[in-house]
Amino acid sequence: MYRYELHMHTKEGSACAVSLVEDMIKQYVKIGFSGAVVTNHFIRGNTCISRSLPWEQLIEQYSKAYTNGRKIAKELDFDLFFGIEEGYGNGKEFLAYGFEPEFLLSRPFLRNADLNIWAQEIHSVGGFIAYAHPFRDRDYITNPDEVPDISIVDGIEGYNRGNRDIENEKAIRVFGNEDTVITAGSDLHSTDFDSAYGIETQHRIRSNEELVKTLLERNFKVYL
């Protein structure tokens, strides 16, 4: 069996993270994971990258966790993927996978894009988009009980390790009977963990295309 983390933050990109990508990878290997997606906060979230930078420089710096992590990932036979976590208003966020940093680099208009545009562009390159931790109730989130429009995205992060149980339970209760992909992710920001959420598969995932295909075909089990 192979286990993959779908929600990981690192110090290179997220202001709230404390561990570097190399150390995060080593810890995931230690607990038996086969791979992870780097999903640092982008410019409408808690990023540590200056939003005033020219687009090319912004993307270069934002992508450092992924580019820096590939060497150690290769050495440890760990499958590392690029992704994002981005805000779409009122403190709410989405996760996206299935593309390389060049996807962002070639689309400077995404600096001011709304959720619909993001979804259209992600789907145009065969990517996957999901609501992150729906129904999370925090001071910075406006109207946490609002049910998001599921028709825009491919799935939801139904199990988030950083959520309260009641928040995850509501996500499963609301969306469990919908035709949407339900994933799991840890939302970890440091190496201070000895277990993690994710997906478990019977096959190894080696490419963006395989990751998206696995998710869309629901060819996995959530791992908690």
For each feature predicted by the language model, list its residue ranges.
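Charged catalytic cores and adjacent phosphate/nucleic-acid-binding surfaces used
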Residues: 1-14, 20-26, 90-102, 120, ...
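Catalytic domains of carbohydrate-active enzymes, especially glycoside hydrolases
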Residues: 23-39
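Short, conserved loop/turn and helix-capping segments at secondary-structure boundaries
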Residues: 18, 59-63, 205
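A short helix->loop->beta-strand "cap" motif at the edges of active sites that frequently abuts
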Residues: 33, 78, 177-180
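Structural detector of well-ordered beta-strand residues that form the stable sheet scaffold
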Residues: 37, 81, 130, 181-183
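Ser/Thr-glycine-rich phosphate-binding loops at phosphate-binding pockets of nucleotides
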Residues: 10-11, 34-47
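Extended substrate/RNA-proximal surfaces in nucleic-acid metabolism proteins
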Residues: 42-157, 162-163, 214-216, 220
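Structural motif
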Residues: 2-4, 35, 128
